[in-house]
């Protein structure tokens, strides 16, 4: 009886895993169709803190600029 329960549980896990892979493949395909032409090119974002920012900044942080690209940010 224990063997039957284990085999049933394993079969259920395999079936759920196959379903999850199919759903992930469909989600990846849909995402690729929604964004044509976007390869793995990094996107760059730039943030600049104005002198009159809402949060008080120390003298060393005034005019601080952050450049963020895919994977890391660096401060200028």
From Swiss-Prot:
Keywords: Antibiotic, Antimicrobial, Defensin, Disulfide bond, Fungicide, Signal. This is Rhesus theta defensin-1/3 subunit A. Residues 1-22 form the signal peptide. Residues 25-45 are annotated as: Disordered. The keyword Protease does not apply. There is a cross-link at residue 65 (Cyclopeptide (Arg-Cys) (interchain with C-73 in subunit A)). Belongs to the alpha-defensin family. Theta subfamily. It holds the Pfam family Defensin_propep. PANTHER family: ALPHA-DEFENSIN 1, DEMIDEFENSIN-3. GO terms for cellular component: extracellular space. RTD-1 and RTD-3 have similar antimicrobial activities against the Gram-positive bacteria S.aureus 502A and L.monocytogenes, the Gram-negative bacteria S.typhimurium and E.coli ML35, and the fungi C.albicans 16820 and C.neoformans 271A. There is a cross-link at residue 65 (Cyclopeptide (Arg-Cys) (interchain with C-73 in subunit B)). It comes from Macaca mulatta. Residues 23-64, 74-76 form a propeptide. The keyword Signal applies. InterPro entries: Alpha-defensin (IPR016327), Alpha-defensin_N (IPR002366). There is a cross-link at residue 73 (Cyclopeptide (Cys-Arg) (interchain with R-65 in subunit A)).
């Amino acid at each position: 009886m224990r063997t039957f329960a284990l085999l049933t549980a394993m079969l259920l896990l395999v079936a759920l895993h196959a379903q999850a892979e199919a759903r992930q493949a469909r989600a990846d395909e849909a995402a690729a169709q929604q964004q044509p032409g976007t390869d793995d090119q990094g996107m760059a974002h730039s943030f600049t803190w104005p002198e009159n920012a809402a949060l008080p900044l120390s003298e060393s942080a005034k005019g601080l600029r952050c450049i963020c690209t895919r994977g890391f940010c660096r401060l200028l």
